[in-house]
């Protein structure tokens, strides 16, 4: 379990980790690295290209909650973006995340 997160977030992340290959999610090790990097750097603004199901966005959002920052995340597929938005809501980070429909080239 991820002791620094609430029970709901822990459960959501564990469920999303089961779909890591299907949704091309980053590994937990990478997620923890990014989380710590954002907190240590006191980042205020982060852009993520490739929202997928929201796994990495949850980690980034939780870190940015600590620093008072915000995340903009971009996803091409509507279905994945909708799933990510639901996961952001469940994990309490939707208020600092701006999800956008688009691709990396635009």
Regions found by a protein language model. Name each.
Residues 1-106:
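A short alpha-helical cap/connector motif
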